[in-house]
Amino acid sequence: MIENLRKRSTIEVEWRKQPVHMDIDLDQVDNPEAYPITVSVETSKDGSDPGLLWQPMHAERDSIVKETIHAKYVLGCDGARSWIRQRLGVSFIGDLTDSTWGVMDIVPKTSFPDIRKVAVIHSSKGTVMSVPREDKLVRFYIQIDAVNPNAASGLARRDLKVEDLLDAARAIMFPYTMEAAECAWWSAYRVGQRVANEFARHDRIFLAGDSVREYCLEVIRCQ
């Protein structure tokens, strides 16, 4: 997709930039020719990841490059911990559950025969959903609390490790085996069914995807 953008337009996709400040000029929002939104972003000089949006910047401050972007529109697709949603002060409406799930992108070593297909596995230990991705990666959504009841507490979630996700997947998928030759990314979260109380601000800043709604993966039990 990115290569097609380069061939067919002047659009360039940039990575590893972290927003740190955003302002909107209310006097210009109704002017279709204006660029009323100012976003300040930071990146490291060597192009490495300057830090996760919900964690302190881990790069040295003297290695950070600052940039100011003037935009007509901003689209926030930055996930459940959306920086843009938080910056706008938009809140979620709905309920959290006591169900804790893990998600991981791994290169699996498994005896499960349909690993390169979208699959949903139910057992007495819980639910696992697998979705094939690029470069031999597979994304796994894993119901952790069914195997580890203590995972429902916030403190326990912070203590979880990728090995805990693998242990839960193994228990649910038994007698199939499961190992990770490589782990590209993982996370754990308490699921809920919530939606943002606002999707757009001044028809200039928009929220989409996980930044605007949460849903419980347990609905797959009913499908």
Curated annotation (Swiss-Prot):
Keywords: FAD, Flavoprotein, Monooxygenase, Oxidoreductase. It comes from the Eukaryota. The keyword Amino-acid biosynthesis does not apply. Induction: Expression is down-regulated by ralstonins, lipopeptides produced by the plant pathogenic bacteria Ralstonia solanacearum. Expression is positively regulated by the imizoquins cluster-specific transcription regulator imqK. It holds the Pfam family FAD_binding_3. InterPro entries: FAD-bd, FAD/NAD-bd_sf, RIFMO-like. Pathway: Secondary metabolite biosynthesis. GO terms for molecular function: FAD binding; oxidoreductase activity, acting on paired donors, with incorporation or reduction of molecular oxygen, NAD(P)H as one donor, and incorporation of one atom of oxygen. Its EC number is 1.-.-.-. FAD binds at R139, F140, Y141, Y189, D210. FAD-dependent monooxygenase; part of the gene cluster that mediates the biosynthesis of imizoquins A to D, tripeptide-derived alkaloids that serve a protective role against oxidative stress that are essential for normal germination. ImqB is a canonical three-module NRPS that assembles the tripeptide backbone of the imizoquins via condensation of Trp, Tyr, and Leu-derived precursors. N-methylation by imqF and phenol oxidation by imqC, followed by cyclization via the FAD-dependent oxidase imqH carry out the three-step transformation of L-tyrosine into tetrahydroisoquinoline. Belongs to the PheA/TfdB FAD monooxygenase family. This is FAD-dependent monooxygenase imqC. It comes from Aspergillus flavus (strain ATCC 200026 / FGSC A1120 / IAM 13836 / NRRL 3357 / JCM 12722 / SRRC 167).
